[in-house]
Regions:
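Transmembrane helix interruption/hinge and helix-loop junction motifs
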Residues: 9-10, 50-52, 65-69, 86, ...
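Transmembrane helical bundles and short interhelical boundary loops of multi-pass, membrane-embedded
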Residues: 239-384, 395
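Membrane-interfacial loop-to-transmembrane alpha-helix junctions, especially the N-terminal start
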Residues: 8-16, 92-93, 168-184, 226-240, ...
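Transmembrane alpha-helical segments
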Residues: 4-5, 46-52, 74-82, 156-157, ...
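Short periplasmic/luminal acceptor-recognition loop of GT-C membrane glycosyltransferases, typified by
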Residues: 333-345, 354-431, 445-461
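Membrane-embedded helix bundles of polyisoprenyl
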Residues: 2, 14-81, 93-108, 281
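Transmembrane catalytic cores of multi-pass membrane glycosyltransferases
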Residues: 27, 67-73, 82-218, 222, ...
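Aromatic/acidic, Gly/Pro-rich catalytic loop(s) in extracytoplasmic/lumenal soluble domains
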Residues: 439-484
Length: 484
C-alpha cells in the first residue's frame, strides 16, 4: 500500500482513504465478486491444522497463479508497458506469461481428460445457471445494480476528465483502457454464457475483472482528493472522498465534475459549494432511517479511516509506534486465545476459530465434538448447510457450495442433487420444495446409497425423519440413521 501511495504521490490522508476504499467499497463490482471480502475463508484455517498441509501449500501456490486473477490483472497493467523499453517490457511480460502457462496448461489437460463427461452446453448450464448464476448470468443481476455501477463509472470518468488538466497522459490511457476492458469482458460474459455457451469463457468468469477496474478508478480518484486537499479545496475533496460510501456515488461524482471549474476558480462563488454540499448530504439519505441505522452503516469505515491515518503520524514517533504495536498484538493474541472473554466484534475479527452464530452452525460444532471424522451427513439442500459443514468439519453427501469444478465433478454434483431431490436438477427447480416432498423412507434409502450415517433436517420439513434424534438447535435437528 505504501508503494502504491508513493507511486500515486498521495499524502497520508489520501493514502488512508484509498486503503479504506479498497477494503470497504464495492460500488464498481458486478457478479457478486469483491476486491476484498469480509467473509471467512475456511480453507485457510483448514490448511493450518491439516496433517497433510503440503497439499494445501500446493493449492495456495496455484491460487497465487490462478488464471482468473493473474490474467485480468495482467491485462489491466498492459498500458503501463506501452512506452517502456523493450527489455523492461520483456522482463515484465515473461513472468506473467509463465504464470499463465503454469495454470493454463494443466487447465487445458484436465479439460481433455474430461472429454465426453459433459457437453459444452451442459457444462455451462451446470456451472453457470445452477452453481454460479450470481457470478455468471447477467440477466439474473438486478437492473438497479447495473444502473448504480454504470452511473458510478460514468460519474467517476466525467470527474476525472474534467479535472485532468496538467495530469499525465498515461493516466487517461489507463482509465480508458480499464473501462473499455470492463465493457468488453461483460459483453463477452453475456454473449458466451447466455447466447453462445462457451465452457472456456464460463470458467474465466469475466465479471471478476470489475473489482480490478474499480481499483484503478478509485486509485485515480484518490489522486484527485490529494490534489484538492493540497489546494485547500476542502469541500470538494470531502465530497469526492465520501461519494463511494453514499447511496448515489455516480451522481455525486458527476455533480462534482460539473461544478469543478467554478469550485477550482481563484474566486469561487458560494452557490456551487452549497449545491455540492447539499447533494452530498442528500446522497446519504439522512431523512431515511434512524440514528442507529446511520451509525451502523457509516461508523465502521469512518473509524477505519481514522485508524489508517495513524501510521504516518506514528512513523515519526518510534516509542509510540512500538507501544501501539504491542497493544495491537496483545489484543489479537487475547482475542485468539480467549474469544469468549471479549466482545463479539473483537472475537470475530481475531479468533481463528470463531464461534458459530446460527442454529446449523451451533449444531455442527456440537456434532464435531461427538462424532468420528469419518461420519457422512445427508443434509437438506439449504444455504445454511454451509455453516453446518464449516463448524462440523464432516463430509456431506452433497451441498450447494463445495464442488469439483471439472466436467466429471460437475456431472457428479448434478447427479447427486437429482438423486436426493427426486426430480431433475435443472434451472428453475426449487430444491427446498423437492426435498420436502421426499418421504422419510426415500431419504433413508438415499443415505444408505451414499454411506451416510446422519441426517440434518428441519422439523417443519419432515415430521418423522428416519433414525433417532440426537441433537437439536432451533428448527433444526440431527438424526443418527440406523445401520443397513
Amino acid at each position: 500500500m505504501r508503494s502504491a501511495a508513493t507511486a500515486l504521490r498521495l499524502e497520508p490522508v489520501a493514502a488512508a482513504l484509498l486503503l479504506v476504499w479498497l477494503l470497504v467499497v464495492n460500488v464498481g463490482t458486478l457478479g457478486g465478486v469483491y476486491f476484498y471480502t469480509h467473509a471467512p475463508v475456511p480453507a485457510v484455517w483448514a490448511g493450518a491444522v491439516a496433517a497433510w498441509g503440503g497439499a494445501f501449500a500446493c493449492f495456495g501456490a496455484a491460487a497465487l497463479l490462478q488464471f482468473l486473477v493473474g490474467f485480468y490483472a495482467g491485462l489491466l497493467a498492459l498500458p503501463l508497458l506501452w512506452h517502456a523499453p523493450s527489455r523492461a517490457r520483456l522482463l515484465a511480460l515473461a513472468p506473467w506469461v509463465a504464470g499463465l502457462a503454469l495454470v493454463y496448461v494443466p487447465f487445458t489437460l484436465s479439460g481433455l481428460a474430461d472429454t465426453g463427461a459433459l457437453s459444452n452446453d451442459a457444462f455451462v448450464e451446470i456451472y453457470a445457471y445452477l452453481r454460479h448464476p450470481h457470478h455468471l448470468v447477467p440477466s439474473t443481476w438486478p437492473w438497479s445494480l447495473w444502473q448504480r455501477k454504470g452511473l458510478f463509472y460514468l460519474g467517476a470518468w466525467y470527474l476525472l476528465h474534467r479535472t485532468s488538466a496538467g495530469r499525465p497522459t498515461l493516466e487517461r490511457t489507463v482509465l480508458h483502457f480499464a473501462l473499455a476492458l470492463a465493457a468488453l469482458t461483460l459483453a463477452a460474459n453475456w454473449l458466451f454464457v447466455e447466447i453462445v455457451p462457451s465452457s472456456l469463457v464460463t470458467k474465466l468468469q469475466p465479471a471478476r475483472v470489475t473489482p480490478l477496474v474499480q481499483v484503478v478508478v478509485l486509485a485515480l480518484l484518490a489522486t484527485r482528493v490529494a490534489s484538492f486537499l493540497a489546494r485547500r479545496h476542502w469541500l470538494l475533496a470531502a465530497a469526492v472522498a465520501v461519494a463511494p460510501f453514499s447511496l448515489f456515488p455516480g451522481l455525486v461524482l458527476a455533480l462534482a465534475g460539473v461544478l469543478s471549474p467554478a469550485l477550482l476558480a481563484p474566486s469561487a462563488p458560494r452557490w456551487p459549494l452549497w449545491l455540492l454540499g447539499a447533494a452530498t448530504v442528500v446522497a446519504f439519505r439522512p431523512f431515511g432511517g434512524d440514528f442507529d441505522y446511520h451509525a451502523a452503516r457509516h461508523a465502521p469505515w469512518l473509524g477505519l479511516w481514522l485508524v489508517a491515518c495513524l501510521p504516518a503520524w506514528l512513523a515519526t514517533r518510534p516509542a509510540t509506534l512500538c507501544t501501539a504495536a504491542a497493544v495491537a498484538v496483545g489484543l489479537a493474541l487475547t482475542a485468539a486465545s480467549a474469544p469468549d472473554r471479549l466482545p463479539l466484534g473483537l472475537s470475530r475479527r481475531f479468533a481463528p476459530n470463531q464461534p458459530p452464530l446460527d442454529a446449523p452452525g451451533r449444531l455442527g460444532a456440537r456434532f464435531r465434538a461427538h462424532s468420528t471424522p469419518n461420519a457422512v451427513v445427508l443434509a437438506a439442500p439449504s444455504d445454511e448447510m454451509w455453516s453446518f459443514k464449516l463448524h462440523a468439519r464432516r463430509a456431506l453427501v452433497v451441498d450447494d457450495k463445495n464442488i469439483a469444478f471439472t466436467a466429471a465433478g460437475l456431472r457428479e454434483w448434478r447427479d447427486r442433487f437429482t438423486h436426493i431431490l427426486g426430480v431433475p436438477f435443472v434451472p428453475g427447480v426449487d430444491p427446498g420444495a423437492a426435498w420436502r416432498a421426499q418421504p422419510p423412507n426415500q431419504l433413508l434409502a438415499i443415505a444408505r446409497h451414499y454411506g451416510a450415517t446422519h441426517l440434518v433436517d428441519r422439523f417443519d420439513w419432515h415430521a418423522t425423519p428416519p433414525g433417532h434424534l440426537i441433537d437439536r438447535e432451533g428448527d433444526w435437528g440431527l438424526w443418527a440413521l440406523p445401520p443397513p
